[in-house]
Amino acid sequence: MKERKKKYVALWQVMQRECRRLVSRPLYLFCMVIAPLFCYLFFTTLMDSGLPQNLPAGVVDMDDSSTSRNIVRNLDAFSQTGVVAHYSNVTDARIAVQEGKIYGFFYIPKGLSAEAQSQRQPKISFYTNYSYLIAGSLLFRDMKMMGELTAGSAARSVLYAKGATEDQAMGFLQPIVIDTHPLNNPWLNYSVYLCNTLIPGVLMLLIFMVTVYSIGVEIKDRTAREWLRMSNNSIYIALAGKLLPHTVVFFIMGIFYNVYLYGFLHFPCNSGIFPMIFATLCLVLASQCCGIVMIGTLPTLRLGLSFASLWGVISFSISGFSFPVMAMNPVLQALSNLFPLRHYFLIYVDQALNGYSMAYSWSNYMALLIFMMLPFSVVHRLKEALVYYKYIP
């Protein structure tokens, strides 16, 4: 009984020591509170309109007829496209694209109206700058739709001239009507698409780096032995006492972004907020344990921080929210399971978007639990580094 009491006392003393270190170093305040809050506000306000609006586009109207002017007005009416300039030739429009003044231009050839009425199949061209993927894709979609509508309008006029009724003309032009229903994000809101994974990913990256730094700086400042002595030479008590205050702070930040996204901004959350808060707690604990593995594998502050930043940044690319994992190379598909953010993303899809029960995501919760068990493989190596390793500047 006394032995257990001594362990609790040692744990409390280590926690008090770590709390004093947290409040005495502004770096901790910045990385654990200020940086996450800044990222929350930055990403959500950066894409507050959901989709980019009025992307600058140009028009080269060589026909200058009532038909071509009507096409330009209709193109400008699309919410994502804003016609900001008219050019006299393709060369000037191309130069404007290269200079970044516009993201694309719509080319209407001379004689469009006359050739359309005489059924000589005039060609409409449009050019978009795919160096900017989102802007180029949105402009391409609008310009392609405008081209199809123009072709349909010309064909409908010909059918009307031949005596077809409106129903007959529309049945010929569009024999199959497509009714689209985007699931989970029907507004096609980029903020919903990105922020639900970017914000937890940034928090995970900061947890990696703060965990590695808080342990590595003990080696650098040669206070590791004092830390171990305070924990009765138990590496488990030492790590628990050091990281529990971090867990509390990061979990509070996690609760805050969940309330902010799903309560204040009303992002889709079909299973309720509590499963997402639990998933956030699992992500925080898994990220801390990964940080222990990183500094235990490379017990040098420089190498440990490099490992943490590299692993954290790769997580954004391989987690599957920007490019589907199923379309990746099979090797990368397997490697994606080595990143906690990947499993959090799958939980988010199941819980928040699809509204499934937590039992449906049991494999992802088990994966995060396995991440929490990983420090047991490096604790003895880490303890040796804390006792014997000498930091070389």
Task: Enumerate the predicted regions with their spans.
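Membrane-spanning alpha-helical segments of multipass transporters and channels
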Residues: 64, 248, 252, 256-260, ...
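Extracytoplasmic/periplasmic domains immediately adjacent to an N-terminal transmembrane anchor
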Residues: 1-190, 385, 392-393
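Cytoplasmic juxtamembrane interface segments
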Residues: 120-137, 182, 213, 291-313
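Alpha-helical segments in transporter systems
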Residues: 28, 32, 245, 363-364
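Hydrophobic alpha-helical transmembrane segments of multi-pass membrane transport proteins
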Residues: 38-41, 181-261
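Residues that define the loop-to-transmembrane-helix transition and helix capping
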Residues: 26-27, 236, 302
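Alpha-helical membrane-protein architecture signal
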Residues: 8, 12-16, 192, 231-232, ...
